[in-house]
């Protein structure tokens, strides 16, 4: 299983889920994605377009010699996972998306649902030059710390902030928002077996897009709603996420290596 993190987090957001998967005998890998890893931090905004992020995951599978993988993502990681599954269904056995619905459903909600439109206002702010870096890094990252609240474990918060306070890292992470393009919302429906997990207490993602998510999955689809939890589902409800991934893998096993060349 490849586990993809979102903003403003790192691979550490998946630590407990990965441990639970390992206990179940399932190997996983959680990379620090483009911009978060100092070895993959281009400076051009165009280098953070969705197709580039998708290419990173396909390249990672190639590097590991994996023809097909189980894919899970949270927040921005969910958007990348949806896009990988839509563009490369031959490489994805199952998809588990957490918090963010299919990008087309999310785009519809931002345009048509006043609540979601208001909740998504931060995305426009994050796309501005310079100002969001100043706001998020000010006063020892107090805005980020408040956003995590007491849900995200202290050691994970420390790791996220260690990464994001490195020179150029916050700008690189925010470039994901600056590189957004309307065409990125027009990805195809997903055909692979999919589980979507959402918490009704998520202050960033509201119900309108969630309820349309299944319209964009033509393969087997399972929806799990967690009552009143936060946006930080992998940290707050790791057993729910790990169990959902495990159940889906058991129903649709594969994770095949690439054939010899």
Q: What does each model-found stretch correspond to?
A:
Residues 1-40:
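Conserved HGGG/HGGXW glycine-rich cap/lid loop of the alpha/beta-hydrolase fold
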Residues 29, 36-68, 72, 76-226, ...:
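Flexible "cap/lid" subdomain of the alpha/beta-hydrolase fold that forms the substrate-access gate
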Residues 10-11, 79, 230:
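A short, glycine- and basic residue-enriched loop/turn
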Residues 260-261:
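A short, charged, Gly/Pro-tolerant segment at domain boundaries
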């Amino acid at each position: 299983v490849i586990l993809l993190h979102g903003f403003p987090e790192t691979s550490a957001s998946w630590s407990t889920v990965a441990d639970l998967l390992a206990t179940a005998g399932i190997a996983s890998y959680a990379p620090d994605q483009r911009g978060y890893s100092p070895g993959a931090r281009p400076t051009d905004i165009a280098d953070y377009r969705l197709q580039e992020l998708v290419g990173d995951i396909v390249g990672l599978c190639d590097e590991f010699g994996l023809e097909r993988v189980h894919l899970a993502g949270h927040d921005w990681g969910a958007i990348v996972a949806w896009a990988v599954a839509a563009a490369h269904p031959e490489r994805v056995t199952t998809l588990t998306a957490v918090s963010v619905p299919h990008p087309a459903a999310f785009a519809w909600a931002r345009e048509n649902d006043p609540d979601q439109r208001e909740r998504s206002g931060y995305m426009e702010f994050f796309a501005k030059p310079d100002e969001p870096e100043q706001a998020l890094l000010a006063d020892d990252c107090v805005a980020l710390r408040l956003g995590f609240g007491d849900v995200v474990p202290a050691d994970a918060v420390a790791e996220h902030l260690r990464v994001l306070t490195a020179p150029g890292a916050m700008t690189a992470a925010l470039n994901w928002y600056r590189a957004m393009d309307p065409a990125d919302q027009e990805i195809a429906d997903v055909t692979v077996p999919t589980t979507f997990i959402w918490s009704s207490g998520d202050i960033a993602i509201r119900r309108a897009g969630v309820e349309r998510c299944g319209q964009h999955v033509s393969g087997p689809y399972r929806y799990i709603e967690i009552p009143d939890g936060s946006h930080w589902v992998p940290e707050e409800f790791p057993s729910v996420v790990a169990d959902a991934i495990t159940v889906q893998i058991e129903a649709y096993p594969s994770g095949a290596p690439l054939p010899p060349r």
